[in-house]
């Protein structure tokens, strides 16, 4: 059981401050309107198949339990926005979860599948890069092996990689430029 002195009394305000530039203060400040009815959890497709409970994440944030930033649960949200649409208090749950994820990532906590998506973008310019199987399938149905919009030009890739380096996104995800993968 947690003790009162272990709670971060300013955590809600940290979340609101972090979310003020994007998605916006109003959206993230809606966190304070949550009265824990559970509509978000009952609506959540991830919650039906995993131990993920949206309401629990929101409750931890409201109580100042900043260890939520270390939790794998925050990465189980699919950002489908069902909770967002169904909340009777108009709490922008998905935007709050994304803001909490951003805080966790800044702290160095990010789910490996999310890091791998970023790796694919830095390697190929696309979160789901074309591979040999995709090329064969496209060819078998009479399409060009490479979709013209699915891959970036070398100039575009250079700009993307420069941007990632300048913003230290590569460091955030632990990207190794030599292996073009995650650092071991």
Curated annotation (Swiss-Prot):
Keywords: 4Fe-4S, Iron, Iron-sulfur, Metal-binding, Methanogenesis, Oxidoreductase
4Fe-4S ferredoxin-type domain sequence ranges: 24-54, 65-97
Required cofactor(s): [4Fe-4S] cluster
SUPFAM superfamilies assigned: alpha-helical ferredoxin
GO-annotated molecular function: 4 iron, 4 sulfur cluster binding; CoB--CoM heterodisulfide reductase activity; metal ion binding
Pathway noted in the entry: Cofactor metabolism; coenzyme M-coenzyme B heterodisulfide reduction; coenzyme B and coenzyme M from coenzyme M-coenzyme B heterodisulfide: step 1/1
UniProt GO BP: methanogenesis
Enzyme class: oxidoreductase
Pfam families linked: Fer4_8
Cofactor note: Binds 2 [4Fe-4S] cluster.
Catalytically driven reaction(s): coenzyme B + coenzyme M + 2 reduced [2Fe-2S]-[ferredoxin] + 2 H(+) = coenzyme M-coenzyme B heterodisulfide + 2 H2 + 2 oxidized [2Fe-2S]-[ferredoxin]; coenzyme B + coenzyme M + 2 reduced [2Fe-2S]-[ferredoxin] + 2 CO2 = coenzyme M-coenzyme B heterodisulfide + 2 formate + 2 oxidized [2Fe-2S]-[ferredoxin]
EC id: 1.8.98.5, 1.8.98.6
Binding site for [4Fe-4S] cluster 1: 34, 37, 40, 87
Binding site for [4Fe-4S] cluster 2: 44, 77, 80, 83
Annotated coiled-coil segments of the chain: none
Record-level GO cellular component terms: plasma membrane
The family this protein is said to belong to: Belongs to the HdrC family.
Function: Part of a complex that catalyzes the reversible reduction of CoM-S-S-CoB to the thiol-coenzymes H-S-CoM (coenzyme M) and H-S-CoB (coenzyme B).
PANTHER family, per the entry: IRON-SULFUR-BINDING OXIDOREDUCTASE FADF-RELATED, IRON-SULFUR-BINDING OXIDOREDUCTASE FADF-RELATED-RELATED
Oligomer status and interactors: The heterodisulfide reductase is composed of three subunits; HdrA, HdrB and HdrC. B1 and B2 subunits are interchangeable, as are the C1 and C2 subunits. The heterodisulfide reductase forms a supercomplex with formylmethanofuran dehydrogenase (Fwd), F(420)-non-reducing hydrogenase (Vhu) and formate dehydrogenase (Fdh).
Protein name: H(2)/formate:CoB-CoM heterodisulfide,ferredoxin reductase subunit C2
């Amino acid at each position: 059981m947690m003790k009162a002195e272990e709670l971060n009394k300013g955590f809600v305000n940290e979340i609101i401050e972090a979310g003020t530039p994007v998605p916006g203060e109003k959206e993230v400040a809606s966190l304070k309107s949550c009265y824990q009815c559970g509509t978000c959890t009952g609506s959540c497709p991830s919650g039906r198949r995993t131990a993920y409970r949206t309401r629990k994440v929101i409750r931890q944030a409201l109580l100042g339990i900043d260890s939520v930033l270390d939790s794998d649960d925050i990465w189980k949200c699919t950002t489908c926005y069902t909770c967002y649409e169904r909340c009777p208090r108009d709490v922008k749950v998905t935007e709050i979860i994304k803001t909490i994820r951003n805080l966790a990532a800044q702290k160095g906590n990010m789910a490996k599948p999310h890091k791998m998506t970023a790796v694919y973008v830095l390697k190929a310019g696309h979160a789901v890069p074309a591979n040999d199987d995709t090329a064969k399938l496209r060819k078998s149905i009479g399409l060009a092996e490479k979709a013209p919009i699915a891959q970036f030009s070398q100039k575009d890739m250079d700009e993307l990689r420069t941007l990632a380096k300048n913003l230290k996104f590569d460091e955030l995800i632990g990207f190794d430029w030599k292996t073009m993968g995650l650092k071991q």
